[in-house]
Amino acid sequence: MEGAGAGSGFRKELVSRLLHLHFKDDKTKVSGDALQLMVELLKVFVVEAAVRGVRQAQAEDALRVDVDQLEKVLPQLLLDF
């Protein structure tokens, strides 16, 4: 992700490359609007994962978020998306 604050997020080039890595047909194209939507979806997903990880860490009286907390919130997060 880019720097913190407003305007931070994933670069379109990165998201486009990630999408194309998983397309079965090399000729598949992604429109600019679809790409922008994926960028926003990834941004929301990552922020939500971080927030849920913090809440889980607080519930466990942990001082920092660790992989363990993220692993605990990930199943429900995936179901919510």
Curated annotation (Swiss-Prot):
GO terms for molecular function: DNA binding. The modification N-acetylmethionine is found at M1. It comes from Homo sapiens. Heterodimer with CENPX, sometimes called MHF; this interaction stabilizes both partners. MHF heterodimers can assemble to form tetrameric structures. MHF also coassemble with CENPT-CENPW heterodimers at centromeres to form the tetrameric CENP-T-W-S-X complex. Forms a discrete complex with FANCM and CENPX, called FANCM-MHF; this interaction, probably mediated by direct binding between CENPS and FANCM, leads to synergistic activation of double-stranded DNA binding and strongly stimulates FANCM-mediated DNA remodeling. One of its GO terms (biological process) is kinetochore assembly. This is Centromere protein X. Its main location: nucleus. InterPro entries: CENP-X. One of its GO terms (cellular component) is Fanconi anaemia nuclear complex. PANTHER family: CENTROMERE PROTEIN X. It comes from the Eukaryota.
